[in-house]
C-alpha cells in the first residue's frame, strides 16, 4: 500500500483536498480521498475531479457507479444505508502498537517545507528531523487506518447479502440525480420496482381522459391535444421546491482542508498550504486557522468543519462519521411572508436556533484579534503561553461546533434519490417547506381551493410524482404524503397548550359552561340570531370595549386571494383554517365549510390552559390523534376517481347543472325566503337552503325523483377568480379560466382559418418574403432557400470554438432546430382550447376554407345522440360509482379510537386517584405537628417547622399537578367526545348530500330509453341501488349508536332520506324499505363495507375489465405497485358484475417504464401526453420504444390483422404527436419511420392529406432547413409513399394539389444539391428519396413526367435508380413468384411463364453468368419500364432484386404476351394482311411516339422486340438499350442490332429519335415482306460500307402496298432531318386506315 498522501486543490475548489493514490486495481488515475463529506475511491480526471468509475461513501448512503466532473452521471447504484446494520472491523493502528515513549508529542515544530516547495504538498514518513519522525508515522498510521476502514466498507457493499438488507436504487443518473429507467429495491420485502425517474423522483402518468371514449371513438381524444410540455414545466417547479438539495451543498465542497485536524498539534502547523492563482498549492507559514476561515469553508456560508482525524476514532462511521457540514449549511432567503407556513425557497438546513448559536460563536472567534497568529509570534518564546491558551481555546470551540454539527447531521439529504423519509424530515424541520410543497401539489395534483391555485382545467393528461416509501415498501404520491405528515397535528397541539395561540373570552367560556353542555355546541351555534356574516364564534361574546366579532379575512399569502376565517387573527388559527379543508373531508360549500371549521377550532380552544402548569404531552396528543382519524387517506385517488366519474357521466348524459345566486340580502320581515344554490366542488355537489337571515346547517334532502340534475361527485372546476401568483421559490401560478366539462360525443363542422399558409420565408435569413410552396412557387425561390441554408450551416460551423467544435455544433444545431420547429407551427403554438389540430384530428367530415384570415379556428358543435350503454361501459360506471360514493372510514376509526380512549382514561383516573389518596395520607396532620413541638426539648422548633412546611408545600404541589392532570385528562376526553359529535354530524350530512346525488344519477339511468339499455340485463339498476343501500344502513347504525348519542336532527335526516328513497330501495330483492320514524328493522344486513386500500396505493383496479385475466379480488383502487419482473405487464384484475368482460391491458396511473407495453397493447392515446411532456429524456425513452412497436407490428402479419379503426387512431395520434413534440433528434425520425410502416395500410389517404396538408407543409420546411438531423430523408420517404402511383397513393386530383403545394423543382433541387460532407450518409439518402418522389409523380401523371423531362432531371433519376437507391417498380420477393414453363431466351435473359398473386405473368430472368450481364443494365431497364406507362408499351408488374450470391436472381415481371414476339407472329402468318400490318405498325408507332415525347429513345426497334398479346395488340418491349435524350451531350452509337441501325449510328454519330424512326422503317419492312433486311450481307464491315457509302436500302417487294412502301422509304431516308416523326407516321397510318 502506498503511504504517500498529497494535498492538492482542484481549479473549481476553494480549499485543499487530501488524497492517496493506489495502483492495485486501477491505473494511475485511481485515488482514495477522505473528506468531511465522505470517502471516495475511484478515478479522477486531469482536473482532479471525480470522473469515471468510483465509489463515494456519504454520511447515510453509498454511491457506486459512473461520475462525470464531480457529478453522478451514467449507470450507478445508490445504497441508502442502515447504520445499525453496518458491521465494521476497525483495524489496530500502528501507533497503538508502539510504546508510549515513541508516541509522545514533541514540543518542537516540524519543518516540511522542503517537500512542499514547488509541488503539491505531501505527507510521508521520510522526515529529516529524527525527533519528529515518530509523530509523522503516527499521523500517517491514523490516516491509513481511516482509509482501510472506508475500503472495508466499500468492499462490503458489493456483497449480495449486504445489498439484500439495504434499500437501494440502480439505474441511470444525470447531473447527480436519478434520471431515466431504474429500479428501486425495498429491503423489507426484497422487492424490485422499475420506474421512470426524473430529478430523483418517480414520474407516472395519470390518464384522466375518459376511458370509455376509446370503446366508441377511434379518433384522437380531444382533451389531450392541448397538453404541451407539462412534465418539463412540472419538473422546473419541482426543482424550485427542493432547491439546495445537492450532494455537496457548498460550491464544489466534496473535500475540505485536511489540516484542520492536524493543526490541533502545534508540531504539524506547516502542513497548511495556500491556493495560488493558477490553482496550485504552496506552503504557508505556521498558523492557526479558525473553523470559519478559508480554506475550511467557502465564503458566505455558515459552516464548521469536523475533524478528519477525530478525537474519538470509534465514531467515524456511526451515523455521522463523515461529519458532513452540508447539514449545517443554511443560506438565508429573505421573504416578505410573516406567517409560520409561508411559501419560500427552502433547502435542507438546521433549526434557526442552532444557526444562531453557530453564528454567535463564529462572531466571537472573529472578534479575537490574536486568534490568527503569524509565524513570528509562534517562534517567539515570550508568546508561547499565549499560543498554547489559544490552541486550547480553539480545541474547545471545535468540540462545541462538532457536537452541533453532529446534531444537525440528522437533517437528511437525498443524494439523488428523494424518499418519503427525506420529505417528511424536511416537513418536520423546515417550517416553510410545507407551504412550498402544498402549493406545488395544488398546481400539479389536486387544486386546493383554500390556496386558490388550481391546476389547468384544460390539461386532462397529467404527470404525477411518486417517491419510495421504504417503511411500507411502496411508492407514495405527494398529496398522500402530505396527509401523513404531522403539520396539522403540530398546529393543533400548539393551539391546545399555548395560550397565545388562541383568543378566548373568559366570560363567554363561563357563560357557555353554565348554560350549554359540551354536547350541544352545534345547537348553540345554530341558535344564534346573527347571520353568517355576523356570527359569534363558539366560546366568545361581545364585550363593551370591543366591536362585534365577525368572520374577517385573514392575512393573504403572496398573491393569494383573501380567505375568511375566525374572529381571532392568530397565525395558528389562520393556518388551520387553510389546512383543515385540505386534510379533512368537509362540505365545500363556502359558508358551510367556514362554519364547520369555526366550530372545530372553537372546540379546540375549550381545552383549558392553567397558569404555571404544563400538561403531559400525551394528553393533548390524544386530541391530535383523534383528529388524525378524520384525515384523508386517499386524497389523490378520490380526486382522480371523482373526476373520472364526472367525465363518464358527461359522456353518457348531457351535463345539466342547476345554479342560482345566493341570497345575501337579509330578510328583515322574517318571511322565509328560500334560495337553492348548487355548488360544483372537488368532492361533491352541496345544496344549501337559506331561510331569511338564518342559515340552517342541516339541509332537508329532497326526494331523488324531484331532482333535475346529477352533479356529484363534483367536477374539478371551481368558480375561483383568475389571478396570477408569483411565489418566492420561482413557481408561477396562474389560475386559468373556468371551462365547462367536455360535451358528449360531438359532430364537428369545421371551418379552418389561419393568418397565412406556412411558407419558407419565415426562416429565410434574407427576408425576401418568397414563398416556397403554393401555385406561385418558383424555382428561384427553392434554390435560394437551399443556398441560404447551406450558407447558414457553414457560418454556424465557422463560428464555433476550435476546442469544442463538435459539441458546440451539436448544441447549436439542437437549439436552432427547436426554434425552427416552434417557428414552423406558430398557429398551433398560439391556440389553446380551439386548437387547429383539434379540428384536424376529428374523425368526422371537415371542410377547408380557401380564404385565409387572421381569425382563429371556429368549431361548431352539433348535438348527437349519446352512445349506447353496453355491458362493458356499465361495469366501468358501476366501479366508478362505488369508488366515488363510499361510507367514510373516519366514522369507524374515530369511534374505535374513542372507545379505547375511554377505557384508557378510566384506568388513568383510577391510578391518579389512588396516588392522590396515598400522598394525602402521607401528609402529617396539624395535631401531630403540635405534639411534636411540645416534645421538642431543644430550641429547634422554628427549623423543624420550616422543614416540615417545605415538605408539605412540595406534597401540595404534587397533589395540584396530579389534580390538574386528572382534570386535563377528563377535559381532553370531553373535547374528543364533542369533536366526535361535531365531525360525525358533518360527515353524515355530507354523505347524505352525496347519496342524494348518487340517487339522482340512478334515476337518470332508470329514465334512459329502452334503445340505449337494450343490451343490459333487466336488473342492472339493482347493482347501483345495493351500494347506496349499504351506505345508508351503516349511517343509520352510526347515528343510533348507544355509546355516543348524536342529535335527534341527524337521525331525522337519515329517516327522511330513507323515506324519500323508498321507491329505489323497493327495487331490491327484499322489497320496499319501511321505517317507523327512528327504526329500520326491515333492512337486511348488507355486506361489510369495502375496506380502504393501503395509504400509498394507486393502481388501476377501477378499470380492470381491460386487464388480461380475472380474479376475485375486492373492488379497491390500489395504486399500482410495479411488478417485480420488468419483462411483463401487470395483468392483475378484478372480478366485476357480471364477469363476461372483454380482457385487455390498461392502467389508470401508468408507470412510464411500461408505457410502450401499454401502447403496444392498443392504448395509443398515451402517446400524446408523453410526446407533449417537453421532457427530452422521457421522449427519448418512447422513441426507443417505437422501435419495439414497429418490430411488434411487423411480425406475424399483425398489420394485416389490426382493425382499420385502430390503425387510423394510431396513425392520427402519431402524426399529431410530431407537431406537439419538438424533439427532432430522436422522436420525429422514429415516428415517421413508424408512419411509413403504417401508411400502406392506411385506408383513407385522401382524407389524410386533406386534414394534415398544413402540417405537411410545415414539416417540408423543416426537411429543407434541417437536413443534417437525419429527419429529411425519412420525411421524404413518407411523402413518396403518399404519392405512390395508382391506388396505393392519393387520387389524381389530390396529386395535382400536392404538386401545387410542393413544386417539382423543389425535389429536383434537393436531388441535385451537391454533397459537401462526404461523411454525411443522410445527404445521399435524401437525394435518393427526392428522386423517388419524382419517380412516383412521373408515373402517376404525364404532366409531371414532361415537367421532369423539361428540367433535364430524367438522367439523374435513372443514374440514382441504376445504383439501386430509388425504384420505379414494385419490389417483389422471390418467394412470391411461381416460375412455370420456358417461353424463350435472348442474349442476356430467358423468359418464363409465371404466376404472381394468382395471375399469369411473364418473368424475365437475367443470366448473371453471362459476360455481358450488368446489374446497371438490369436496374436501368426496370426503371424505364416503371417510369413509362402507355397501352402500347410493355406493362411492368414489378421486379425482384435479390442479394447477389451464387443463388441470386434478378427478374423482371411483366404482363404476359400470349402470342410472343411480333417476329413469331410474322413467321406463323406470313404474309400478313394489310389490316394486320397497319394495326401492328400503328400500335408500335404510338408506343414510340410516347417514348419520344418523354425524351426516351429505344435504340433497338425490330420485330423481335415487339410483343403481341392475345388480342393482337402490339407493344414495344425490351428497353435494355433505351437511353434518355440529353441536350447537353450526344449519345454513343453502341446500340442495338446493326442491320436495323441508321447510317449515322453506324458511323458513330449521335443517336436521336430519328434513329428510332429508321429502325421503325426496318421493322415495317419486316411486317410488309416477312423477311429480315439485308439477308445477303453477313458482316458488319460490309454492312457499314453498303449502307453508309453506297446508300444501300433493302429491296421492297412489288406485292407491298404503295403507301406502305412509300412510308418505308421515308423512314429509311439517309438524312435524319428528312425522316418523318412518329406523330407524322401515326397520322399517315390513321388516314389510310380510315
UniProtKB/Swiss-Prot annotation:
Q: Which InterPro entries match?
A: Kinase-like_dom_sf, MORN, Prot_kinase_dom, Ser-Thr/Tyr_kinase_cat_dom, Ser/Thr_kinase_AS, Ser_Thr_protein_kinase
Q: Write out the GO biological process terms.
A: signal transduction
Q: Which UniProt keywords apply?
A: ATP-binding, Kinase, Membrane, Nucleotide-binding, Repeat, Serine/threonine-protein kinase, Transferase, Transmembrane, Transmembrane helix
Active-site residue list: 1500 (proton acceptor)
Compositionally biased spans, kind Polar residues: 110-119, 340-351, 716-732
EC number per UniProt: 2.7.11.1
**Subcellular localization(s) per the UniProt record:** Membrane
Sorted alphabetically, the Gene Ontology cellular component annotations on this record are: cytoplasm; membrane
Quote the catalytic activity from the record. Answer: L-seryl-[protein] + ATP = O-phospho-L-seryl-[protein] + ADP + H(+); L-threonyl-[protein] + ATP = O-phospho-L-threonyl-[protein] + ADP + H(+)
Bias type Low complexity, positions = 89-109, 120-131, 273-292, 318-339, 352-367, 658-688, 703-715, 787-813
Q: Where is the signal peptide?
A: none
Q: Which SMART domains match?
A: MORN, S_TKc
Keyword Ribonucleoprotein found: no
Q: Where are the MORN repeats?
A: 40-63, 169-191
Give the transmembrane ranges. Answer: 1255-1275
Residue span, Protein kinase domain = 1377-1634
Annotated binding of ATP, by residue:
1383-1391, 1404
The GO terms this record gives for MF are:
ATP binding; protein kinase activity; protein serine kinase activity; protein serine/threonine kinase activity
Q: Where is this region: Disordered?
A: 84-131, 273-367, 658-750, 783-816
Protein topology in the membrane:
Single-pass membrane protein
Similarity section: Belongs to the protein kinase superfamily. TKL Ser/Thr protein kinase family.
User: What PANTHER family has UniProt attached to this entry?
Assistant: SERINE-THREONINE PROTEIN KINASE, SERINE_THREONINE-PROTEIN KINASE DDB_G0282895-RELATED
> What is this protein identified as?
Probable serine/threonine-protein kinase DDB_G0282895
Q: Which organism is it from?
A: Dictyostelium discoideum
Amino acid at each position: 500500500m502506498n503511504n504517500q498522501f498529497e494535498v492538492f486543490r482542484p481549479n473549481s475548489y476553494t480549499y485543499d483536498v487530501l488524497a492517496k493514490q493506489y495502483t492495485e486495481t486501477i491505473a494511475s488515475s485511481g485515488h482514495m480521498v477522505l473528506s468531511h463529506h465522505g470517502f471516495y475511491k475511484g478515478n479522477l480526471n486531469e482536473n482532479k475531479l471525480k470522473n469515471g468509475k468510483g465509489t463515494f461513501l456519504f454520511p447515510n448512503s453509498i454511491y457506486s457507479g459512473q461520475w462525470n466532473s464531480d457529478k453522478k452521471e451514467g449507470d450507478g447504484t445508490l445504497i441508502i444505508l442502515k447504520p445499525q446494520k453496518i458491521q465494521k472491523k476497525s483495524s489496530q493502528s500502528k501507533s497503538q502498537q508502539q510504546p508510549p515513549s515513541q508516541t509522545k508529542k514533541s514540543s518542537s515544530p516540524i519543518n516540511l517545507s522542503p517537500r512542499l516547495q514547488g509541488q503539491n504538498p505531501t505527507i510521508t514518513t521520510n522526515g529529516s528531523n529524527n525527533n519528529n519522525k515518530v509523530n509523522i508515522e503516527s499521523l500517517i498510521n491514523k490516516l491509513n487506518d481511516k482509509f482501510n476502514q472506508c475500503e472495508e466498507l466499500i468492499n462490503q457493499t458489493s456483497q449480495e447479502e449486504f445489498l439484500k438488507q439495504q434499500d437501494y436504487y440502480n439505474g441511470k443518473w444525470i447531473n447527480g440525480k436519478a434520471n431515466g429507467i431504474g429500479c428501486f429495491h425495498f429491503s423489507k420485502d426484497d422487492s424490485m420496482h422499475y420506474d421512470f425517474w426524473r430529478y430523483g423522483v418517480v414520474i407516472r402518468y395519470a390518464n384522466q381522459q375518459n376511458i370509455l371514449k376509446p370503446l366508441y371513438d377511434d379518433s384522437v381524444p380531444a382533451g389531450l391535444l392541448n397538453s404541451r410540455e407539462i412534465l418539463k414545466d412540472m419538473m422546473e417547479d419541482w426543482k424550485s421546491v427542493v432547491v439546495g438539495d445537492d450532494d455537496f451543498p457548498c460550491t464544489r465542497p466534496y473535500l475540505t482542508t485536511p489540516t484542520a485536524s492536524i493543526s490541533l498539534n502545534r508540531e504539524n502547523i506547516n502542513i497548511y498550504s495556500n491556493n495560488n492563482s493558477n490553482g496550485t498549492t504552496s506552503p504557508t507559514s505556521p498558523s492557526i486557522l479558525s473553523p470559519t476561515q478559508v480554506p475550511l469553508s467557502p465564503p458566505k456560508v455558515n459552516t464548521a468543519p469536523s475533524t478528519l482525524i477525530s478525537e474519538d476514532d470509534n465514531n467515524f462511521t456511526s451515523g455521522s462519521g463523515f461529519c458532513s457540514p452540508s447539514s449545517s449549511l443554511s443560506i438565508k432567503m429573505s421573504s416578505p411572508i410573516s406567517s409560520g407556513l409561508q411559501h419560500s425557497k427552502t433547502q435542507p438546513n438546521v433549526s434557526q436556533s442552532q444557526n444562531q448559536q453557530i453564528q454567535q460563536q463564529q462572531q466571537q472567534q472573529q472578534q479575537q484579534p490574536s486568534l490568527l497568529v503569524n509565524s513570528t509570534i509562534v517562534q517567539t518564546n515570550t508568546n508561547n503561553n499565549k499560543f498554547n491558551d489559544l490552541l486550547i481555546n480553539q480545541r474547545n470551540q471545535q468540540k462545541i461546533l462538532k457536537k452541533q454539527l453532529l446534531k444537525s447531521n440528522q437533517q437528511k439529504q437525498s443524494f439523488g434519490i428523494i424518499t418519503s423519509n427525506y420529505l417528511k424530515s424536511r416537513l418536520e424541520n423546515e417550517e416553510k417547506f410545507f407551504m412550498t410543497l402544498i402549493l406545488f401539489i395544488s398546481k400539479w395534483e389536486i387544486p386546493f381551493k383554500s390556496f386558490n391555485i388550481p391546476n389547468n382545467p384544460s390539461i386532462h393528461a397529467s404527470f404525477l410524482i411518486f417517491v419510495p416509501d421504504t417503511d411500507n415498501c411502496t411508492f407514495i404520491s405527494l398529496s398522500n404524503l402530505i396527509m401523513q405528515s404531522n403539520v396539522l397535528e403540530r398546529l393543533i397541539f400548539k393551539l391546545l397548550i399555548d395560550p397565545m395561540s388562541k383568543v378566548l373570552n373568559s366570560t363567554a367560556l363561563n357563560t357557555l359552561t353554565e348554560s350549554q353542555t359540551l354536547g350541544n355546541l352545534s345547537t348553540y351555534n345554530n341558535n344564534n340570531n346573527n347571520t353568517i356574516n355576523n356570527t359569534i364564534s363558539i366560546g366568545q361574546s361581545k364585550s363593551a370595549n370591543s366591536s362585534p366579532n365577525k368572520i374577517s379575512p385573514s392575512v393573504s399569502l403572496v398573491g393569494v386571494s383573501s380567505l375568511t376565517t375566525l374572529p381571532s387573527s392568530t397565525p395558528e388559527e389562520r393556518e388551520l383554517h387553510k389546512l383543515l379543508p385540505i386534510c379533512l373531508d368537509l362540505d365545500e360549500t363556502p359558508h358551510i365549510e367556514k362554519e364547520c371549521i369555526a366550530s372545530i377550532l372553537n372546540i379546540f380552544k375549550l381545552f383549558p390552559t392553567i397558569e404555571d402548569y404544563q400538561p403531559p404531552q400525551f394528553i393533548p396528543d390524544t386530541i391530535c390523534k383523534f383528529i388524525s382519524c378524520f384525515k384523508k387517506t386517499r386524497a389523490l385517488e378520490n380526486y382522480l376517481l371523482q373526476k373520472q366519474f364526472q367525465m363518464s357521466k358527461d359522456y353518457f348524459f348531457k351535463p345539466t347543472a342547476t345554479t342560482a345566486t345566493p341570497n345575501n340580502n337579509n330578510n328583515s320581515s322574517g318571511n322565509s325566503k328560500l334560495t337553492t344554490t348548487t355548488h360544483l366542488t372537488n368532492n361533491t355537489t352541496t345544496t344549501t337552503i337559506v331561510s331569511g337571515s338564518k342559515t340552517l346547517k342541516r339541509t332537508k334532502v329532497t326526494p331523488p325523483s324531484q331532482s333535475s340534475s346529477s352533479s356529484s361527485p363534483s367536477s374539478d372546476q371551481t368558480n375561483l377568480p383568475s389571478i396570477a401568483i408569483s411565489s418566492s421559490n420561482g413557481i408561477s401560478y396562474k389560475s386559468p379560466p373556468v371551462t365547462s366539462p367536455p360535451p358528449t360525443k360531438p359532430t364537428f363542422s369545421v371551418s379552418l382559418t389561419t393568418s397565412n399558409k406556412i411558407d419558407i420565408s419565415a426562416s429565410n435569413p434574407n427576408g425576401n418574403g418568397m414563398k416556397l410552396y403554393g401555385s406561385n412557387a418558383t424555382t428561384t425561390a427553392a434554390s435560394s432557400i437551399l443556398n441560404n441554408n447551406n450558407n447558414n450551416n457553414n457560418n454556424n460551423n465557422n463560428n464555433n470554438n476550435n476546442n469544442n467544435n463538435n459539441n458546440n455544433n451539436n448544441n447549436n444545431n439542437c437549439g436552432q432546430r427547436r426554434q425552427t420547429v416552434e417557428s414552423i407551427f406558430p398557429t398551433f403554438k398560439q391556440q389553446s382550447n380551439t386548437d387547429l389540430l383539434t379540428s384536424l384530428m376529428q374523425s368526422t367530415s371537415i371542410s377547408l376554407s380557401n380564404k385565409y384570415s387572421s381569425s382563429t379556428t371556429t368549431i361548431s358543435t352539433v348535438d348527437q345522440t349519446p352512445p349506447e350503454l353496453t355491458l362493458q361501459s356499465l361495469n366501468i360506471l358501476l366501479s366508478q360509482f362505488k369508488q366515488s360514493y363510499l361510507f367514510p372510514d373516519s366514522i369507524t376509526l374515530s369511534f374505535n379510537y374513542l372507545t379505547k380512549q375511554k377505557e384508557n382514561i378510566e384506568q388513568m383516573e383510577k391510578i391518579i386517584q389512588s396516588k392522590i389518596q396515598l400522598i394525602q395520607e402521607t401528609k402529617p396532620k396539624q395535631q401531630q405537628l403540635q405534639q411534636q413541638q411540645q416534645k421538642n426539648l431543644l430550641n429547634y422548633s422554628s427549623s423543624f417547622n420550616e422543614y416540615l412546611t417545605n415538605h408539605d408545600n412540595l406534597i401540595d404541589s404534587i397533589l395540584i399537578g396530579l389534580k390538574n392532570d386528572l382534570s386535563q385528562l377528563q377535559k381532553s376526553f370531553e373535547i374528543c367526545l364533542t369533536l366526535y359529535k361535531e365531525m360525525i354530524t358533518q360527515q353524515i350530512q355530507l354523505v347524505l348530500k352525496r347519496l342524494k346525488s348518487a340517487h339522482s344519477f340512478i334515476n337518470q339511468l332508470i329514465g334512459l330509453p329502452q334503445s340505449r339499455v337494450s343490451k343490459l340485463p333487466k336488473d342492472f339498476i339493482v347493482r347501483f341501488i345495493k351500494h347506496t343501500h349499504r351506505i345508508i344502513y351503516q349511517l343509520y347504525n352510526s347515528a343510533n349508536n348507544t355509546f355516543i348519542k348524536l342529535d335527534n336532527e341527524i337521525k331525522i335526516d337519515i329517516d327522511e332520506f330513507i323515506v324519500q328513497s323508498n321507491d329505489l330501495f323497493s327495487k331490491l330483492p327484499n322489497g320496499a324499505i319501511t321505517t317507523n320514524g327512528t327504526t329500520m328493522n326491515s333492512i337486511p344486513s348488507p355486506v361489510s363495507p369495502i375496506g380502504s386500500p393501503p395509504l400509498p396505493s394507486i393502481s388501476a383496479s377501477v378499470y380492470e375489465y381491460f386487464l388480461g385475466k380475472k380474479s376475485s379480488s375486492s373492488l379497491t383502487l390500489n395504486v399500482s405497485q410495479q411488478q417485480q419482473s420488468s419483462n411483463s405487464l401487470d395483468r392483475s384484475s378484478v372480478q366485476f358484475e357480471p364477469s363476461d368482460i372483454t380482457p385487455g391491458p390498461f392502467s389508470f396511473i401508468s408507470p412510464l417504464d411500461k408505457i410502450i407495453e401499454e401502447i403496444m397493447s392498443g392504448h395509443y392515446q398515451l402517446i400524446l401526453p408523453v410526446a407533449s411532456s417537453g421532457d427530452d429524456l422521457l421522449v427519448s425513452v418512447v422513441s426507443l420504444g417505437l422501435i419495439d412497436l414497429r418490430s411488434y407490428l411487423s411480425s406475424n402479419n399483425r398489420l394485416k390483422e389490426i382493425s382499420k379503426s385502430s390503425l387510423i387512431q394510431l396513425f392520427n395520434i402519431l402524426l399529431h404527436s410530431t407537431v406537439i413534440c419538438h424533439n427532432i433528434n430522436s422522436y420525429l425520425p422514429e415516428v415517421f419511420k413508424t408512419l411509413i410502416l403504417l401508411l400502406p395500410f392506411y385506408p383513407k389517404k385522401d382524407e389524410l392529406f386533406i386534414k394534415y396538408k398544413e402540417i405537411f407543409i410545415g414539416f417540408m420546411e423543416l426537411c429543407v432547413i434541417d437536413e443534417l438531423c437525419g429527419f429529411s430523408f425519412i420525411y421524404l420517404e413518407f411523402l413518396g409513399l403518399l404519392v405512390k402511383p395508382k391506388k396505393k397513393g392519393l387520387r389524381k386530383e389530390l396529386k395535382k394539389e400536392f404538386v401545387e403545394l410542393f413544386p417539382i423543382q423543389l425535389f429536383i433541387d434537393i436531388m441535385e444539391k451537391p454533397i459537401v460532407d462526404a461523411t454525411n450518409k443522410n445527404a445521399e439518402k435524401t437525394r435518393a428519396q427526392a428522386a423517388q418522389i419524382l419517380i412516383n409523380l412521373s408515373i402517376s401523371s404525364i404532366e409531371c413526367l414532361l415537367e421532369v423531362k423539361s428540367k433535364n432531371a430524367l438522367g439523374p433519376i435513372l443514374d440514382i435508380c441504376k445504383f439501386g437507391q430509388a425504384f420505379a417498380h414494385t419490389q417483389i420477393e422471390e418467394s412470391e413468384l411461381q416460375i412455370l414453363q420456358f417461353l424463350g431466351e435472348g442474349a442476356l435473359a430467358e423468359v418464363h411463364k409465371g404466376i404472381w398473386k394468382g395471375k399469369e405473368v411473364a418473368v424475365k430472368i437475367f443470366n448473371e453468368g453471362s459476360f455481358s450481364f450488368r446489374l446497371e443494365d438490369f436496374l436501368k431497364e426496370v426503371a424505364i419500364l416503371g417510369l413509362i406507362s402507355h397501352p402500347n408499351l410493355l406493362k411492368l408488374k414489378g421486379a425482384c432484386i435479390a442479394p447477389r450470391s451464387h443463388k441470386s436472381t434478378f427478374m423482371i415481371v411483366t404482363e404476359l404476351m400470349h402470342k410472343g414476339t411480333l417476329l413469331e407472329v410474322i413467321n406463323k402468318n406470313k404474309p400478313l394482311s394489310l389490316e394486320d400490318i397497319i394495326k401492328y405498325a400503328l400500335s408500335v408507332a404510338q408506343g414510340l411516339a410516347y417514348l419520344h415525347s418523354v425524351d426516351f429513345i429505344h435504340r433497338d426497334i425490330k420485330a423481335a422486340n415487339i410483343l403481341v398479346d392475345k388480342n393482337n395488340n402490339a407493344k414495344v418491349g425490351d428497353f435494355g438499350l433505351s437511353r434518355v435524350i440529353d441536350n447537353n451531350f450526344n449519345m454513343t452509337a453502341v446500340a442495338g442490332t446493326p442491320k436495323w441501325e441508321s447510317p449515322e449510328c453506324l458511323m458513330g454519330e449521335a443517336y436521336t429519335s430519328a434513329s428510332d424512326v429508321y429502325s421503325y422503317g426496318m421493322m415495317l419492312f419486316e411486317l410488309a415482306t416477312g423477311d429480315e433486311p439485308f439477308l445477303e450481307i453477313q458482316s458488319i464491315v460490309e454492312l457499314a460500307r453498303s449502307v453508309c457509302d453506297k446508300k444501300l436500302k433493302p429491296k421492297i417487294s412489288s406485292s407491298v402496298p404503295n403507301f406502305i412502301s412509300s412510308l418505308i422509304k421515308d423512314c429509311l431516308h439517309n438524312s435524319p432531318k428528312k425522316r418523318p416523326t412518329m406523330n407524322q407516321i401515326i397520322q399517315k397510318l390513321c388516314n389510310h386506315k380510315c
